[in-house]
């Protein structure tokens, strides 16, 4: 089963919620302002922010042909095109090698699991991978990552619990440089985005990578639980201010009925979703495909 098929299965809840409401809207045969107001309400109820929903509706108004609002197929295709455009406007090129990927985020979003899945993904692309256990505060975090590293068959760099996470990163990138490793993936401790001291620690890790491995393509990716909904955008805004994020990794995409916040990440913060988890298995994480995502929810 390809990622496209997995995506369709994972997004069934979102599709049922979003496209179901659209069908009801078309059945009412509303036109003009009434139609646009209800379309905006549908977008907002699917966790698209107010400002992004207003932007989508404005684009529909600008592009729609007079007399076509009652044509369900026409409006659906127009909406599809607009939503794809919003996501593609923030897209970035795939990383160049060598690259360092540092995963950040709050507790419980699945960062450590995502490190293992990303390691498997890059290994399947023929790349050499090292993972760094820089979550030195959570009990048994490095042991959990060791299990994932063993399953993915990649090298792990770790220190004792309570060690300085920046020291782990220093050792990992130094070793990767010496060995010619293609990809280093860094696991970090979960942190509340309101704790400034923890954010300062992230900035220190950022500086270590930039100083010790300047030739590497360095991506700082925020891991977001897709079931968080609109609050995910607030998390992204604060983490972006702290470390200038390069993109998003979504987990639990199969567990949400409201995926609309993804459009707000792109529209308001210019943050692309780079990878998405669509299941529990090691291989259930792939590059995010904007067009496939929109097709799956419409």
Indicate residue ranges for each PLM-predicted region.
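Primarily NTPase-proximal linker/entry elements flanking Walker-type ATP/GTP-binding cores
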Residues: 13, 17-134, 141-186
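N-terminal accessory targeting/assembly segments
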Residues: 1-18
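Glycine-rich phosphate/diphosphate-binding loops and the adjacent beta-loop-alpha structural elements
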Residues: 62-65, 191, 244
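Short glycine-/small-residue-rich Rossmann-like dinucleotide-binding loops
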Residues: 107, 189, 225
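Short, glycine/acidic-enriched loop or turn micro-motifs at the edges of active sites
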Residues: 136-138, 161, 190, 228, ...
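Alpha-helix N-cap/helix-start motif
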Residues: 4, 53, 72, 111-115, ...
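Conserved catalytic-core segment of NTP-binding enzymes
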Residues: 165-179, 194-298
